[in-house]
Amino acid sequence: MDEELLKRAVSIVEENIDNFEFSTDEFAQKMNMSRSNLHLKLKAITGESAIDFIRKVRFKRATELLKSGRYTVTEVSSMVGFNSSSYFATCFKKYIGCLPTEYIKKVKG
């Protein structure tokens, strides 16, 4: 059951990945549960809050897109739901540990 819930949660976030207004309220609504129930379930299964779960899915996709080499950092930031590439870069560094441009250099080696 937990695995099904996680698959559904990932699918919903991926469907809304480019929507910078996608919120935990909307996420909970699409999961057919209250925001607090979603938070509790995700916390129990993954150890993450709903917002951290959304971020994890977004940054996983961002790293995939950056690795592909087909998109600029600005394009990737928009594709994963950030309306500002500078804010994306700040969050990326906080979550991944380096700036997107540094990440691209690392993966191209």
Regions found by a protein language model. Name each.
Residues 1-7, 15, 29-31, 44-52, ...:
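Short, Lys/Arg-enriched, Trp-marked, Pro/Gly-tolerant hinge/linker segments that flank
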Residues 10-22, 42, 46, 63-72, ...:
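Basic, amphipathic alpha-helical hairpins
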Residues 23, 34, 49, 72, ...:
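Short coil/turn motifs that cap or connect alpha-helices
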Residues 25-33, 38, 42, 76-83, ...:
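Append "Primarily bacterial transcriptional regulators
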Residues 39, 55, 73, 95, ...:
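Residue-level detection of beta-strand scaffold positions
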Residues 44-83, 105-109:
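Terminal helix-turn-helix DNA-binding modules in bacterial transcription factors
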Residues 90-109:
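…primarily DNA-binding HTH/wHTH and HhH modules…
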